[in-house]
Amino acid sequence: MKVLTTALLLVTLQCSHALSPTNCDASKPLAEKVLDLINKGRRSGYTFQLLRVSDAHLDRVETATIYYLVLDVVESDCWVLSTKAQDECLPAMRTSEVVIGQCKVIATRYSNESQDLSVNGYNCTMRSVSSAYINTKDSPVLVDSFEDSEPYRKLARKALDKYKAENGDFASFRVERAERVIRMRGGERTSYFIEFSVRNCSTQHFPRHPPVFGLCRVVLTYSTEASDLETPEYTDLICEVFNTEDLKNRSDMKPHRGHEHPHCDKHLCKLSGPRDHHHTHKTHEIGCPPPPEGKDNSDRPPLQEGALPQMLPGHSGPSGTNRSHRPPHNHSCNEHPCHGQHPHGHHPHGQHPHGHHPHGQHPHGHHPHGQHPHGHHPHGQHPHGHHPHGHHPHGDHPHGHHPHGHDFLDYGPCDPPSNSQELKGQYHRGHGPPHGHSRKRGPGKGLFPFHQRQIGYVYRLPPLNVGEVLTPPEANFPIFSLPNCNRPPQPEIRPFPQTASKSCPGKFEGKFPQVSNFFEHTPPK
């Protein structure tokens, strides 16, 4: 009995000293670099900008330092696939566009060199604060932000079709999905602000680096009494297009000049008549070529640039628990190549033993979307609340919400959209392709140097109401990492800390300081 008590005491002491609280404000420079890695790895949505380091702990293991960070963020006006430099991206300029969030992140640094910083995993929850922030009884304008943007995709498609009829060089682009929808009502007018992603679907011969996809912003204005949204009184459309070479050059190690859209210079150019205004904008970026070809990640961030460890999808227990473990044995680069097959039964994207199929093909009638025969639900709720073998392939989803959208690059640039499958799983990123489609990728394959396995998720929850606060993200991270051949074996990742550092949260920075009221943490003393 004494031996058992001593052993338990030693384990308790070891765990209690595993993580050291650290100063949030002092952690800000590192947090900004971590957030930049996350932004560069995501495939849809808008880039995050740091508002505050809300909590920070660290763990030193030999030559590595592992950081456990809670970051308060706000969406910028830059789409994640934009090639703009981060310092060119602005936070929301109007309160009607403010979307805030919080991310729990685990990152590892092996030295003080920025290239030795990598992201092990992250979970973010995002919510619009427009309605809660603006809509008061005295407000002359009412603002609504719509979580479900799919009903407005038709309006975006109609606006794009009208633009394409007037501009033949844009004829091969189609609407991918509506990314953000805001309605403003006031006076005698109602306006819809719709931002939507587009891709080039032409199979014709293009110059060396054709524009492949982009982001469009359309303003549709109606009279207050208008009930037919398909006939706006005024339409204003602006598009920003990107090409594959731009995406390859998203790091700043080696300069490379982007290529211009054939009909525009690097500034905004007007391409239509006075009633319906349309513009395109070509951006530039400098960077370096990508690493060996591989699968990109979804909002996942999915992460994109930098040397990130290769991770398996997270396995989590019941909601609110953390399950981070050391690998059962050492995995060398010889045992597990950095790219390719993974022995020992680990299959992050291919076929999964024991019925686990979070990505890729779904045998035995398991479909990535829709109904699942025999009661199998690889991505939604499981009968009686049980997941196969106690593991959920994507971790716990807050309030039943799944990561937003699908991977923008899941389809090649010339693949037609699937009406039945393309957007059914709009709130669950990371699905495999529609049943019957292969995982082969189009020209967009292998554009990003982020490691191939999805290591993070972004959950978009309904807009906040007055008096509500942001729902904190879960701390569900991958079960273990595979080695990076250029670094020593990954140190053990411990459960995410449940108590806050005494020197946190840090100083809140943002254009709208009142937004801090929507976070759980109170301002620092």
Swiss-Prot record:
Alphabetical list of Gene3D superfamilies matching this protein: 3.10.450.10
Cystine connections: 24-504, 78-89, 103-124, 201-414, 216-239
PTM description: N-glycosylated.
Signal peptide: 1-18
Start-end of Basic residues biased regions: 339-392, 426-443
Gene Ontology terms, MF aspect: cysteine-type endopeptidase inhibitor activity; heme binding; heparan sulfate proteoglycan binding; heparin binding; immunoglobulin binding; metal ion binding; serine-type endopeptidase inhibitor activity; signaling receptor binding
PANTHER family (alphabetical): FETUIN, HISTIDINE-RICH GLYCOPROTEIN
Record protein name field: Histidine-rich glycoprotein
Organism: Rattus norvegicus
Lineage: Eukaryota, Metazoa, Chordata, Craniata, Vertebrata
Gene: Hrg
